[in-house]
Amino acid sequence: MIGVDMKLETLVNNGPAVIFLCRAETGWPVETVTANIVRFGYSPKDFISGGLGYADIIYPADLEIAVSQFFSYVEKDYIGKDLDYKVEYREYKGEAGEHKRNGKGNIGKDRGGYDSFTQQYRLLNKSGDVLWVEAEIKVLEEEEGKAGLFQVTVFDISRWKHTEKAMPAALDTENELKRIINSGHVIVFLWRAEPGWPVDFVSENISELGYTPEDFTSGRIVYTDIIHPDDLDNVRAEVSKNTEEGRDYFSKEYRVLAKSGEVRYVDERTLIRRNEKGEITCYQGILLDITQRKEAEELILSQNRVLERIASGASLDEVLLLLVNYAEEMKPGLLCTVMLLDREQKRLFYGACPSLPKLYSKAINGIQVQVNSETAGTAAGTGKRVIVGNIMKDPFCEECREIAQKVGLKACWAEPIFSSGGEVLGVFTIYLRETRKPREEELEFIRTNAYLAGIAIEHVQAADALKESENRFRTIFDNINDQLYIREPDGISYMDVNQVVVDRLGYSKEEILNMKAEEIIPSEYWASVRENMQKIKAEGSRIFEAGAVCKGGTVIPLEVSARIIDYGGKKTIFSVSRDITERKKAEVAQRLNGSRLEALVKLDQMAGASLKEITDFAREEAVRLTGSKLGYLAFMDAYESTLVMHSWSDSAMEECSIEDKQFVYPVKSMGLWGEAVRQRKPIITNDYPAPNPLKKGYPKNHVHLIRHLNIPVFDGKRIVAVAGVGNKEENYDESDVRQLTLLMQGMWQLIQRKQLEEALRTYSGELSRANEELRSVNMMKTEFVEEMMFPEKAEYGEIMDYETLYAIDSQQQKAVNTFIHYSEKLRRLVDSLLYQSLEKAGKIDYSFEETQLKDVLSDAFLNNVFLIGEKALEVKKEVSASLSEIKGDREKLTALFTALIDHAIKFTPQGGKLALEVKEEAGNVHIVIADSGKGISKELIPYLFDRLYQVNDSITRRYQGLESGLYICKNIVDAHKGEIWFESEEGLGNLMHVKLPK
């Protein structure tokens, strides 16, 4: 039996008929072929490998008729949606016969018992020669709804065909074939292998692209002229590659341009013809228009992309613009738009119109929804498709005709966009720059895009509504000033928190939700929170205090109001936690204020204490009130160049083990702690160990500083002391600055008061001694006069002469002058103490009114007339009679200039000169009082207007300067918003300047 089979196989493989077993798929791929295929120049491998299908060797001019007859036979769309030829049975039924399909599309005996048929057509051998064959086709297998495998038995009838056919018959056959080719959908080309691929032959159905065969065969157009510019390089590369690899056949897809400029997709299948030398003679191929398939693929792709953007939550504007852009890419030359319906206004507004001329879109935007209101308005109003092939003639376009003409719009097609419930959402509109109506596939294109736009609009609107609702809730949730926490009653972590929690704690929301609740709640509150959670579950609500730990470790005190709520279908505890940091600070501040007031009261009551007791008390209270571990106090010299360390706090002295402690610190060489003097303001350093270019380092065994605060203590504008504290557990802040400043200013005022009282006692004692001395001299004079009046009581030689009496008078005058000097000093001290007391009590009042300054100056000179006369001073005044009035307190101004003139007289020698000059300047009156005294050292000038100033560096020595009243003078000028300054050079006299606003 095996031998018989082998003989049979040998007979078949060597017989005259070549047998193919083909699959009913695109290109008719070959499952097997007999070995005698070598008759046609091929090998079985050429087909079985998939390199060639049976359809590839059919002569191009015969391919369509062979396909159509096959379709007619199997009575089914064999190619279906898989075959690139896109030629279906319905297109050929007129030629192939009016066969009807049965219900399942079966073949065979349902066709009347015939299970095979015969065709005659031409094949191409491998060298490109044409062979006439007779092919018997028999279906061997079937699948449900389509053919499976079929057998093709091919006989070479070329010789018989040539013998049988006479020339006329051959001509008739050729004409018939041409007719079939020219009337089919497959365009046949014959190209020369030259640059540009000139065309030797093209079928007449090239007219489907708008061209004539003569356009190509005449040489006016070469084939590369119609290939889309973006695809030309790829096509050239593909042809070159297949040519170099020695292939005889290849296929490719690309775009070509119709004569109108319209883009078409084609599938080209090409045979490469070579001569005996292997040189390429020509390219023979067919073009199949696959535009419809490509557009369907692109439409599906664009729909998927639009749907992806919808699903990703893109905005409606973005989705509609994407949809319109894809539509315009698929159909170049069409201007696509989407208009959205505003139900309240009953108008259409553009959602996307990227290519529509702005002049037209601006005019149509907001068009009313009604019949005869432009194409889109009519479509929305009627809910039906509106096709306008010629805008210039259609009644629907009367309102927009003129503008459309200006921008070159000639046709318009509008499709209503519906929701799933059938409501009109808008209109998908296409504008053209040519007058025509849409083709069938374009109508489907419009409908599909309108449907997709409806999905997008409805989805986005629904998503927007949901998002808006969620946003309203989230906005309220996140913008409540309190911290909001949601957790399950027995949950160990939080289900949700608001943005305030995120902002205040410094964690991301994800971090907070992944943390245990007790990682956020400080440990000191754990027991209290657990207890309150149990009470909330039992009672439903609870108010209690707790805290939250920030990412940086800071604890925020909270007042928690918690209750049971339903959240997302779950029973949860909703906690409204109010930050009570400010309240806690206020409580602390209140306690501090109480402590500060207590400290200031105690300080005020220490008038009888020693300087050491006062400074020690102030320093230790500064440490206590700021919560510090250490403190110090240093006094400044008169020139603000050197600090003298007065004392350290007890705690600092316990920690410090420096053997040779430094007490005198030049400001220039001081480190970071000297910035309070250099910058003349409080300096807070909450990270003292951090590198700082201003730090000079501290000695071995010095107290280690972590945090530091120091302040300058002012007397007027002059720094008189520096106080500092350090190593507070928390950061220093402005509250600490305020505590330290108030305490140290109180200390300094007490020191001043003690020094003034001491000066008062000293001057009082000196005045008493001067008074006793004066009384003693008076007694001596009385006794002497009595002896002169009663000479009998003494011998002549014992009587004193008048020279002795004159000496007694001189001594008496000296005592009187001394008494007057100390009396005047005492008066000024008392006046100054009184002014300081009134200033401290806030009882110095000013009464501002229009005042004649020349009258004030006249009164001031009158008050000093006796002093001027005693010194026989020459006075010169330059005051304009038309001097402007100023707004001031006449009494205070009189006191001001009386004191300044008194000061000038004091520094002017006997018989010297005193000058007054008053001049008006822009917005001010400038008064200058000059004397011819010896002048004052420049080093003392900056301190003349201080309440006190040092004459040496000892804090215990007396201060001078208040007696002069210049401090009071400056306060009066400041109250009038004026300026006062002093100019002097030793030996050249003094100039006192005052500027007062008009």
Swiss-Prot record:
One Gene Ontology cellular component annotation held by this UniProt entry: plasma membrane
Localization annotation: Cytoplasm
EC number: 2.7.13.3
Pfam families: GAF_2, HATPase_c, PAS_3, PAS_9
Function: Heme-binding sensor kinase component part of a two-component regulatory system involved in methyl sulfide metabolism. Does not act as a phytochrome-like photoreceptor.
One of the record's GO molecular function terms: histidine phosphotransfer kinase activity
Protein name from the UniProt record: Methyl sulfide methyltransferase-associated sensor
Protein encoded by which gene: msmS
Residue span, GAF domain: 314-458, 609-752
NCBIfam families assigned: sensory_box
Domain (PAC) ranges: 117-169, 250-302
